[in-house]
Amino acid sequence: GTTGEPKMVAHDFTYPLGHIATGCYWHNLHEDSLHLTVADTGWGKAVWGKLYGQWIAGATVFVYDHEKFHPADILQMIQNYHITSLCAPPTVFRFLIREDLTHYDLSSLQYCTIAGEALNPAVYGTFRKLTGIKLMEGFGQTETTLTIATFPWMEPKPGSMGVPNPEYVVDLLKTDGTSAAPGEQGQI
């Protein structure tokens, strides 16, 4: 849908199980978690971040339906409802760090994940400096589940999506079609 009209992707009944890695490992959720994903329900990220893996992990899912994004609203919700985990595109974090975070009690927030676009290292650094929280990047598609991620046991490297999800074999290809060596850039 990001390059044209939305396209249908069929999944079978096993698809939700593929999100165990998303909810339990990448989002780092558990039974005491209150998780918010900022995603429209028409986007594949909604089932990624609001439903399958999160419920499998036993987390409570906080759903907020907004017609227009206001960063102060997100910060107020984190404060008022004691949200512990947040997943959003990097653009959301770009707007959050423009707010005066000292006006909000974000002490309940323990873990943040990002997906949907590349993360600017400056946004990562600013958010971490202001909150003490690392932004854990992930990559996947509607047709798959979480394919590459920075998992809780890893130290994030701004500009790197992380490592392959153990559920997948991932190969990065150079422009000539051969596999990229460790440290080389390539296409998934």
What residue spans do the PLM features occupy?
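Conserved AMP-binding/adenylation subdomain of ANL enzymes
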Residues: 14-34, 41-84, 99
